[in-house]
Structure formats: structure tokens, C-alpha cells
A protein has these predicted regions:
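Residue-level recognition of single "structural anchor" positions
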Residues: 2-350
Length: 350
């Protein structure tokens, strides 16, 4: 069986251009070093070319997009959830209970949009292909702040996306650890602590090769409490788990009557991937860490939001275009409006 997020997954091919760290790309794409008056032929050609690029990347809503919006089925009022509403114009409705008017996009992340929904397609494709927000914004001719704002919207749509995921059958399970920010790093005698320490953030990862979970443990080291909290509602009773010899996993085995197969680090160290019994979960660790490295300054307080995004990227549908359409579908049906000023009060990433 092909690995989850397997070798054909586009994220494994990250070009050098997505590792840019150039201060000059932070300026607006249309911030030219010359004014609009008395341009030389070269300046005029240069300016018009960039304006054409920008216009191509910032289209107005197409007829297809308008048709799509008009095709959305309204099930209830986005304000009070009442099913008592009437049509009040072309794709405009009025609720009989709360007396408020709304459209198919009201209270979604596309509410009051200034950029067409179609612009999201490229943004999401870049995000799912492990681009950083900085390089994606540059490629899309958008301000970097727009990329950060849209990422926050993605987080809102995906909140709780893993809540109902339950793994069964043979499950590969292991914790993954990510570093805390430098300002919170604990040192001893001027040196960082080694191994699994308070300088790490734990994420519980498990997969049955068809689907997976990425749940923040809330601890630096596994405990009985954190293990049960992390995996307890996501593993079907009676399943088989293949894991390392972490002692806290025993509580999970006992509570859910699991069949336990364990391998110590000494048994797996140095093994080729195909020979390592924990490779299915190790592969997910590697992909998740690779994605996070592209967003190195991410806010650790929102780590579960990042893990929800990782989960969405590495789980079905495996086709990236289908994944984009799946996200749009979820976003349209989710009453989660995100206001720019409120969301940008705090930086989530760079």
C-alpha cells in the first residue's frame, strides 16, 4: 500500500525558490522606484508589464464564480440557524426569526471578500505543496499580510476537523516533538537540554495507513493523562497498535483492550525505511516537520491549528485539486467569518 502522503506527493519536491529569505521581496509588487510622470520607454514597459501581471493575478469575479455562488443551497440562517427564511432578491435571503438579511457567503470566510474566491485556488495549492506564506504571496502578487490573513481563515475553517476521526485495524503510533521558540528555551550551564525535554512540544501521531491523526499532547513528555487525552477518543477498541516502548501507552492499551506490539529504539535504529516497523508513522513525522520548517516562525500557541492543517494536507482526498475543492466546500458550509482587524492583532506566522 502506498504511504499516506506518499512518494508521489508534491510536497516532497520543494524547490530552492521556496526557501527565499530576501528582504527585498517584502516590498509591494507595485512599489516602483519611479513615479507616474514622464516615464522613459524602458520604465513604461517595465511598469505596464508588472501591472499586467498584477491584473492577471487579481481578477474580478468571473461568470463561473457568480454561477457557483448562485448554485449554493441555503439550509438555514447563518446568524441564528433558523430554517424559516424567505428569498429576498437574487441569492439574497431574509430570516423570519431574527429578521436579518444574508447571502450564500454571509458569515463564511468569503464574506465581504475583496478578492474573488477563485484566487483561493492558487493560494491553497501553494499551501498544500508546502510553500511558505512569504513565497506564496510573492508568487500570487499578494501582500504578505493577505497571506497571513488567509492562513488564519484556513485555521478557522479546519478547527475541530479531527474531532470525529477514529482509527481502527492496525495502527502505528508515536509522538513527534517540535522545538519551542528561542525565548522559551530552557538551558543548563548555558547549553540546551538534550533529548525529550521541556524545550519540546509534543504531538501525538497515529495512522492506520488510510487516515491519521495529529493531536497536540500539551506536554513535553508523555504521561498517562496526556496519552489518554490525546489518543483515547481516536482509536477504536480492540485495535492493534504498533509503537515504541513508551510506558504511558500501557494505559491506552488497557483502557481500549488493544493488542500491543512494541519495538524499542535499539531495535529500529539504523534500519532502512522499508524494514522499520514504525516507518508509516515516522514518514508522517518527517512530512509534518518539513511543512513546519517552511513556517519556522509559527506561533506555538496555535500549534493545534497547524496540526489540523497538516492533517488536512496528508489525509484523503490525495489529489491536490480535489483537496482544494474539498476545502472550499467545507468553508462555504462553515459559519466562520474572520474579520481582518481582529485576526491580525496577533501574528501567527511570517
Amino acid at each position: 500500500m502506498k504511504k499516506l502522503g506518499g512518494f508521489d506527493y508534491s510536497s516532497l519536491e520543494i524547490s530552492n525558490r521556496h526557501k527565499m529569505n530576501n528582504k527585498y521581496i517584502r516590498k509591494s509588487i507595485r512599489a516602483f522606484p519611479f513615479g507616474n510622470d514622464e516615464l522613459t520607454p524602458e520604465e513604461k514597459l517595465f511598469k505596464n508589464t508588472f501591472e499586467e501581471w498584477y491584473s492577471a493575478k487579481h481578477r474580478t469575479a468571473s461568470n463561473d464564480e457568480i454561477t457557483f455562488i448562485n448554485s449554493i443551497t441555503i439550509k438555514n440562517c447563518p446568524y441564528c440557524s433558523s430554517i424559516k427564511f424567505i428569498k429576498d432578491g437574487i441569492q439574497k435571503y431574509k430570516c423570519n426569526d431574527c429578521n436579518r438579511s444574508f447571502t450564500p457567503l454571509t458569515n463564511t470566510i468569503f464574506d465581504s471578500r475583496k478578492i474573488p474566491i477563485s484566487e483561493w485556488f492558487e493560494f491553497l495549492l501553494h499551501l498544500f505543496e508546502f510553500h511558505s506564506i512569504k513565497t506564496s504571496s510573492y508568487d500570487n502578487r499578494n501582500a504578505e499580510s493577505t497571506g497571513r490573513y488567509w492562513l488564519i481563515k484556513v485555521f478557522e475553517v479546519l478547527k475541530g476537523i479531527q474531532d470525529d476521526v477514529v482509527l481502527d485495524g492496525t495502527i502505528y503510533l508515536d509522538e513527534m516533538y517540535l522545538p519551542k521558540i528561542k525565548s522559551e528555551t530552557v538551558k543548563k550551564n548555558g547549553k540546551k537540554l538534550r533529548g525529550i525535554s521541556n524545550n519540546k512540544l509534543g504531538v501525538g501521531v497515529a495512522t492506520n495507513k488510510d487516515k491519521s491523526i495529529f493531536i497536540v499532547t500539551g506536554t513535553s513528555k508523555p504521561s498517562v493523562t496526556s496519552t489518554l487525552r490525546t489518543y483515547g477518543s481516536h482509536i477504536k477498541e480492540g485495535s492493534t497498535i504498533i509503537h515504541d516502548k513508551e510506558k504511558s501507552h500501557n494505559a491506552l492499551v488497557n483502557k481500549l483492550n488493544l493488542v500491543s506490539i512494541t519495538y524499542s529504539s535499539k531495535e529500529t535504529v539504523g534500519l532502512e525505511d522499508k524494514e522499520n516497523p514504525l516507518d508509516p508513522v515516522n514518514n508522517l513525522h518527517n512530512l509534518a516537520k518539513r511543512f513546519i520548517r517552511e513556517h519556522g516562525s509559527y506561533d506555538r500557541d496555535n500549534l493545534q491549528d497547524w496540526m489540523n492543517l497538516v492533517w488536512f494536507i496528508l489525509n484523503p482526498p490525495n489529489d491536490k485539486y480535489s483537496k482544494v475543492l474539498k476545502f472550499i466546500e467545507i468553508a462555504i458550509s462553515s459559519p466562520k467569518r474572520v474579520k481582518y482587524r481582529d485576526s491580525m492583532m496577533k501574528n501567527f506566522t511570517k
